[in-house]
Amino acid sequence: TSAFMQAFTHNPTEPVYDDSDPDAGGYSRIKAMEYYNPVAIINERNMESKNDNYGANIRATLNILPIKGLKWENFVSYDKEQYETREYYTHYYPSLIGTNGQAYIENYQENDTQYESTLNYSNIFGKHSIQALLGYTYQYTYSTSASMTNSGFDFDDNQTHYIGTGTNLTEGKASMSSNKEDNTYIGFFGRFMYNYDDKYLLSASLRRDGSSRFGDNN
């Protein structure tokens, strides 16, 4: 529920507070309309999020002697992302009045590993120029997530820190979910280029990719 949209569409002369309605926490509300007090939307919820990202990569090149023009290049990278989201809506959050507070927690983590290796050859023999490339690439991604929503708290002080104390859990009404996903990608590729006297050019390339996302035999 957007506080901005509620403020934009509501009668500006409507009071913000109404002490005669304790169920709404002293906020003004119109029960017959799908209108939610924008001030209550802002004040009666707490949203926290934490996001951490880590990454590292290494690149190395080796000249392979005694073959002139032949190089072996390798690249390795690792990235990790994780975040946690916590949301709490008090007893007086407009669209949830009667649920006695609602808490939500979500955790997500993803790890991504990549490796690429290539052999590069480049040389000139008189009027002849040759360039060749052979490569291999690998990527593995692994992610997990979990979330939980619970309602029915005696008071709002604990927010999301004791999410298991809500009565919806004991009544079998709380929602929980978790997920795990991992994907692997592998690719082989090559390219060959021949140039004669900067007049004639011959080129060829190939590539073969496979991924766990593609299904069997791919």
Q: Predicted segment positions?
A:
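Repeated loop/turn-to-beta-strand initiation elements of outer-membrane beta-barrel proteins
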Residues: 66-70, 127-130, 200-202
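Surface-exposed loop/interface segments of Gram-negative outer-membrane beta-barrel transport/assembly proteins
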Residues: 1-55, 73-186, 213
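Structured alpha-helical segments in the cores of large, soluble enzyme domains
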Residues: 186-196
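Substrate-binding cleft of carbohydrate-active enzyme catalytic domains
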Residues: 58, 190, 200
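A conserved hydrophobic secondary-structure block that centers on an alpha-helix together
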Residues: 51, 62-71
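Short glycine/threonine-rich loop-to-helix capping motif typified by GTGT followed
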Residues: 216-218
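Residue-level signature of outer-membrane beta-barrel architecture
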Residues: 60-64, 121-123, 194-196, 204
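Transmembrane beta-strand segments that form the barrel wall of outer-membrane beta-barrel proteins
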Residues: 202-214
